[in-house]
């Protein structure tokens, strides 16, 4: 028996909507990364984009455990301006209370996806919205109840 390898024409993508209200960030991000890659499907093929399209709503209500929210020793995001001494840092709490709270989820998932062209294509299938409204109702997404999968998922 030969190993099955899917062809691009055989790949069927589903649309999922996940409510991130009171969900732990790392647990959600790891599950979303698996679904974006398509590793939850028996027809997974490593060199093809066989993952699903995922819509995450209520991103501003995501939860972090421990001291990660506002503590400087907790979750800190670094960036560099490109100038000498230009390293900047911010905490997850500042990002969540800022203008674009969905960036926390996008960064967490992006850092769990492979860093190549295929990973960029898979990240384009992720749609994160800060509130409960999204413009993808025409795709008829299926609700994925992440909170009920494990009691540790919800905080």
UniProtKB/Swiss-Prot annotation:
Q: What is the name of this protein?
A: Large ribosomal subunit protein uL13
NCBIfam families listed in its UniProt record: rplM_bact
GO CC field: cytosolic large ribosomal subunit
Which parts of the chain are coiled coil?
none
Q: Which domain of life is it from?
A: Bacteria
The cross-references to PROSITE patterns, in alphabetical order and at most eight, read: RIBOSOMAL_L13 (PS00783)
CDD domains for the chain = Ribosomal_L13
Keyword annotations for this protein, in alphabetical order, are: Ribonucleoprotein, Ribosomal protein
List the InterPro entries. Answer: Ribosomal_uL13 (IPR005822), Ribosomal_uL13_bac-type (IPR005823), Ribosomal_uL13_CS (IPR023563), Ribosomal_uL13_sf (IPR036899)
Q: Which Gene3D superfamilies match?
A: Ribosomal protein L13 (3.90.1180.10)
Keyword presence, Ribonucleoprotein: yes
